[in-house]
Amino acid sequence: MADAAIRTCYAAGMDPDVLRIKTRLYSGNEIAMGPGKADLLEAIAQHGSISAAGRALGMSYRRTWLLVDAMNRCWREPLVQTAAGGSHGGGAQLTPLGHSVLGDYRALQKRLSAAAADAPEQAALVAALLPDPRPTRD
């Protein structure tokens, strides 16, 4: 975040991270990649399992599997490769395209956040934003 925006946040008693950029890539109407799906890919790479990745992220196995299925349907090749269970256990790993998409997505997130941090519009938005929303009227 630009220095002016940070100073404005602190002066207003607000968290300097109040404006966050969320990058989503779409395939048709389906979110092909977003912050949560990138976190899931990282967890699968770390744990080697869809179920373990879901547990680490506090997601049900069904939710985790649906997200993996959605990602695999949105790209020219699957991002996650699975192996069936059995006596040796199953598992999951990122494909080469999965590693590439994850790396490119994280780099794009970083670049877009840096560009927004330097934008004077961000300081103006922070200056106009309330620290907390007003209560609703009953």
Language-model-detected regions and their locations in the chain:
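Short helix-boundary/capping micro-motifs
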Residues: 44-53
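Residue cluster at the C-terminal edge of the helix-turn-helix DNA-binding motif
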Residues: 73-78
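Short, Lys/Arg-enriched N-terminal segment that forms or immediately precedes the first helix
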Residues: 16-29
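Residues within the DNA-recognition helix of helix-turn-helix
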Residues: 67
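Basic, amphipathic "hinge/linker" alpha-helix immediately C-terminal to the N-terminal HTH DNA-binding motif
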Residues: 82-107
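C-terminal regulatory/oligomerization modules of transcriptional regulators
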Residues: 118-138
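Alpha-helical linker/hinge and terminal dimerization helices associated
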Residues: 104-123
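Central "turn" residue of the DNA-binding helix-turn-helix
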Residues: 58-60
